[in-house]
Amino acid sequence: MEWLGETAYGDALALQQAAVADRLAGRTPDRLLLLEHPAVITLGRSSDPANLRVGEGGLRELGVELFEVARGGDVTYHAPGQLVGYPIVDLDGLGRRDVHAHLRSLEAGLIEALEELGVPACRVPGWTGVFVDRGRSARRDGPERKIASIGVGVRRWVTFHGFALNVRLDLEGFEAIVPCGLYDVEMTSVAVELAREEGPRALDARRLAKLDQRVREAVARSMQVQLTS
C-alpha cells in the first residue's frame, strides 16, 4: 500500500499510466495506490451526458475539474475526505483473467473494511459498488445508501482505476451529478453512518481526526487479502 495524500487528478492519471507500464514490463510488483483528489468529476466509458447536472462552465465556477476517463461505469465525484484506491494488479499473474471477479474482490475488500469500522455494508444485486446494509443499520428507511463507487480499466490484464470510499467528504458535491447513473440511490459516508450507529460521539473532533488513518489501515488490510488470494 502506498499513501500519496492529496493528488491532482491529472497527475494521478499519469502516475497510473506509468505504473501500468512498469507492471507490464515486470519492473514492479502489484501495487495499491491510496490517495485523495481535489474536487473533480469523472466520466466513465458508460457515462450518459444527462447524468451531469451542471455544465462545464458551472463546474469551473465551483472549482470542480471534469475528466473523461477509460474506466467502466458512469459519472462519479471525488473530493477531499474520500479515500480513492487504484490497484495496479496483474490479473494474468494471479491466474484469473476475469474483470468481474476483480470487481467483486474490490467490493469484498471494502465491505470487510467497513464492517471492521462498525458500518454494516453489503452488495446490491445488479449494481457495482458497496452499499449500507439497511437491514442491519440504525436507519432502515429510505432509498439504498451507496458508500463506495467502483470502476476499473484493464490493459493487457493489468488493472488501473479502482474504488472511491466516502469517508467524511461534503456529500453536497454529489448534487452536481446522478452518481453512477443511479437515480434512486442516496450517497452516504463512513462519518455519517458511524454517527447513526454510535450517536454524536462518532463526530467528536478527536475521533474524526483519526478516522482517515483508521479507514486507510482497514482498507489496506482487507485489500491485501482480496487482491492476492
Predicted regions and their residues:
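Generic serine detector
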Residues: S46-S47, S105, S137, S149, ...
